[in-house]
């Protein structure tokens, strides 16, 4: 399809978009009494209108049933998390038994590293990407310290080549081979938060395991955003947050994946708690831990149902839409946004550069735009004019055209506002 930078063409694309009506199912902030153009679903997704009803249901059950809500609520609280197994399994490409919800992202990665980072002898090193999200960096450093190693020795970062913004797959594979029998764990972000680069999870997982290491993934920017087949790709473990593309609300619960081949391994260590205990015997208060079969055996504490309610509202919407439809629109609307940016770049003196890969196979619902010069003032201009974007140091505006609530006309309007902002500087 040949794109056009006109409002009429954008409206035509919206009219043909099977997901366009979902935009009306979200609540948008307003600037100057006008609905914003929202590009920050990669930081915090918008609130679905249905969310309040899910929360109200829990609040009403709490008011009317109090403690009995654990067993007699409309959706009983004691097994509330099981409602996520089926929809989450489809979002991340897993068996229902391989996924659960609990805690928050970095907490879950720490807990999973208890099981899957077991340094021994000369096999103690961790491979991660250069400039991983800071929370991951702090996690790696603290885990390595805990086991008695020095981060500068035990943490191996895969570097970008000089003058390049993204990490080459061949460099990831070469680093895994180089570290070889010293490698204990590969843990990379499925989508890099800064550049929007999508990593080849299947190929990297196979390479890490061939080297004798466990392979896990931080899917904070991947879950609900890219096609995942965690079970078929033989991924050892993964975790993700739910408040970005999955629209569950600020700081909300995380999801975890543990491959089924690890479920019955008696030698695999884990930190345990009563919510990971055999569900049928949980309230018998027995002294010895008998883990729930599957990823649920990694749960520790009673789950925060009020937090899970908006998460459930979101995953049920995902089940309605389906990942294939989301990804099809994601690729198309991201390409249209890329086209708009290139058109603006032709019209004005070049002040920016898209650092996200141009290959649709290597990106998802994000374009990271590196701004030369006084980029922060352009970001501020966009915000004042109703375009909510995300600023990341150094000098990058991240744009996430989330397919559930962004329209093609939004892309056109953004381009016009961006052009005025650049020319007005």
Curated annotation (Swiss-Prot):
This enzyme's EC code(s): 3.7.1.3
Cofactor dependency: pyridoxal 5'-phosphate
Binding positions (pyridoxal 5'-phosphate): 105-106, 133-136, 218, 221, 243, 274, 302
InterPro entries linked: Aminotrans_V_dom (IPR000192), Kynureninase (IPR010111), PyrdxlP-dep_Trfase (IPR015424), PyrdxlP-dep_Trfase_major (IPR015421), PyrdxlP-dep_Trfase_small (IPR015422)
A Pfam family hit: Aminotran_5
Family annotation (SUPFAM superfamilies): PLP-dependent transferases
Gene Ontology cellular-component terms listed: cytoplasm
Pathway noted in the entry: Amino-acid degradation; L-kynurenine degradation; L-alanine and anthranilate from L-kynurenine: step 1/1; Cofactor biosynthesis; NAD(+) biosynthesis; quinolinate from L-kynurenine: step 2/3
GO biological process: anthranilate metabolic process; L-kynurenine catabolic process; L-tryptophan catabolic process to kynurenine; NAD biosynthetic process; quinolinate biosynthetic process
Reactions catalysed according to its record: L-kynurenine + H2O = anthranilate + L-alanine + H(+); 3-hydroxy-L-kynurenine + H2O = 3-hydroxyanthranilate + L-alanine + H(+)
Keyword vocabulary terms for this entry: Hydrolase, Pyridine nucleotide biosynthesis, Pyridoxal phosphate
Entry GO MF terms: kynureninase activity; pyridoxal phosphate binding
EC supergroup of this enzyme: hydrolase
Residue positions, PTM N6-(pyridoxal phosphate)lysine: 244
Function: Catalyzes the cleavage of L-kynurenine (L-Kyn) and L-3-hydroxykynurenine (L-3OHKyn) into anthranilic acid (AA) and 3-hydroxyanthranilic acid (3-OHAA), respectively.
Complexes and interactors: Homodimer.
Homology family: Belongs to the kynureninase family.
Name of the featured protein: Kynureninase
Source species of the chain: Flavobacterium johnsoniae (strain ATCC 17061 / DSM 2064 / JCM 8514 / BCRC 14874 / CCUG 350202 / NBRC 14942 / NCIMB 11054 / UW101) (Cytophaga johnsonae)
């Amino acid at each position: 399809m040949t794109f056009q930078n006109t409002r009429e063409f954008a409206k035509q694309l919206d009219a043909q978009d099977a997901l366009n009506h979902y935009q009306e199912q979200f609540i948008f902030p307003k600037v100057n009494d006008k609905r914003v153009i929202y590009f920050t679903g990669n930081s915090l997704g918008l609130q679905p209108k249905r969310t309040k009803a899910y929360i109200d249901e829990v609040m009403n059950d709490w008011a009317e049933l109090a403690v009995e809500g654990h067993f007699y609520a409309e959706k009983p609280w004691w097994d509330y998390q099981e409602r996520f197994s089926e929809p989450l399994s489809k979002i991340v490409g897993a068996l229902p038994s391989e996924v659960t919800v609990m805690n928050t992202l970095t907490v879950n990665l720490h807990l999973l590293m208890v099981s899957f980072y077991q340094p021994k002898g000369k096999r103690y090193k961790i491979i991660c990407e250069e400039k991983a999200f800071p929370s991951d960096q702090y996690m790696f450093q603290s885990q390595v310290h805990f086991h008695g190693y020095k981060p500068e020795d035990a943490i191996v970062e895969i570097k970008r080549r000089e003058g390049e913004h993204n990490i080459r797959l061949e460099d990831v594979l070469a680093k895994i081979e180089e570290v070889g029998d010293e490698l204990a764990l590969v843990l990379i972000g499925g989508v890099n938060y800064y550049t929007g680069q999508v990593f080849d999870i299947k190929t990297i997982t196979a390479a890490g395991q061939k080297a004798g290491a466990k392979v896990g993934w931080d899917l904070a920017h991947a879950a609900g955003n890219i096609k995942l087949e965690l079970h078929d790709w033989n991924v050892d473990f993964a975790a993700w947050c739910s408040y970005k593309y999955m629209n569950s609300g600020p700081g909300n619960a995380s999801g975890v994946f543990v491959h089924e081949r690890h479920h019955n391994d008696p030698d695999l260590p884990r930190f345990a708690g009563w919510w990971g205990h055999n569900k049928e015997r949980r309230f018998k208060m027995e002294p010895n831990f008998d883990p729930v079969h599957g990823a649920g055996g990694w749960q520790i504490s009673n789950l925060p149902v009020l937090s899970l309610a908006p998460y459930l509202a979101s995953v049920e919407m995902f089940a309605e839409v389906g990942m294939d439809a989301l990804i099809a629109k994601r690729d198309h609307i991201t390409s249209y946004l890329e086209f708009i940016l290139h058109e603006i770049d032709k019209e004005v003196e070049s002040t920016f550069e898209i650092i996200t890969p141009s290959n649709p196979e290597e990106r998802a619902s994000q374009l990271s735009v590196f701004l030369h010069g006084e980029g922060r003032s352009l970001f501020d201009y966009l915000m004042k004019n109703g375009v909510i974007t995300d600023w990341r140091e150094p000098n990058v505006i991240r744009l996430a055209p989330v397919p559930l609530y962004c329209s093609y006309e939004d892309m056109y309007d953004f381009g016009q506002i961006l052009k005025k902002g650049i020319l007005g500087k």
